[in-house]
Amino acid sequence: MPEKKQPQIRSGNDPKNAPALRKSERTRQSILDAALEFLWTHPFRELTVGELMSLAGTSRSAFYRYFEDLHDLMEVLLRGVEEDIIEVAGPWLQGEGDPIPLLEETVDGLVRVCYQQGPVLRAVSDAAPMDERLEKAWTDFLKDFDDAATQRIEQHQAVGLIKPFDARPVAMALNRMDAYLMIHHFGRRPRGNRESVRNAMLRVWVSTLYGDEALTRFLSRSKTSTNAKKK
């Protein structure tokens, strides 16, 4: 992969450079925002630099100050989604204590991120079978979460929270379910119901990893919480 071009900005510690830094960041972000908006209604193959920069409201030449090409742009968008997911997945991946509330918190965050950025997942996954570079980006994206989930499952198996089984295939199955469920519901407008997607994911994750008793407790607690909100 070619080395990424970065904005030629001197140290942000110099107050004289602060306006330039802010302007550069705003321009780059406007390009990313325009790409996301385009992807709500179009596949990646229809994206052009000219149309993108028209949507962003800046010159075509400005694009190449921030990105090598459109593939680089998509890789940046996908990395942004990955970073956001890693952040919200922290409770289950790293937290201590009862894993079910930690898993709920993680899934809540995951749904929130993908509800906002679902078109990026759809665009990359749809293009991957016909585009070698995006295929690698998508494969690497999924593998990172397969690795993280496998490690966490094995940690919980080691302390008796999860029964023994081959962790990696199960982690892969759960992650593929998450990815394609959210692509289906959040990859284009109108988007699906966030609560329904969240509940479906939690049912499968809790029952698969922690068993039917844990699922029963989770459903009972969820029902109590729902009833309390209605009062």
Residue ranges and their predicted role:
Residues M1-R26, F165, E213-K231:
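N-terminal intrinsically disordered/low-complexity leader segments
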Residues I9, N13-A20, M53-H71, V113-Q116, ...:
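Basic/polar phosphate-binding segments, predominantly the helix-turn-helix DNA-binding elements
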Residues P15-A18, T41, L77-E104, L121-R122, ...:
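Amphipathic alpha-helical linker/stalk segments
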Residues K23-A35, L52, L77-I85, A149:
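Generic hydrophobic, amphipathic alpha-helix propensity
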Residues S30, F38-D72, V76:
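Helix-turn-helix
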Residues V76, E87-Q116, V170-L174, R198, ...:
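Hydrophobic alpha-helical connector segments
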Residues E83-I86, V113-Q116, E132-A158, R168-M172, ...:
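Amphipathic alpha-helical packing segments from all-alpha helical-bundle domains
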Residues L102, C114-R133, T150, Y180-G187, ...:
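Amphipathic alpha-helical segments used for helix-helix packing
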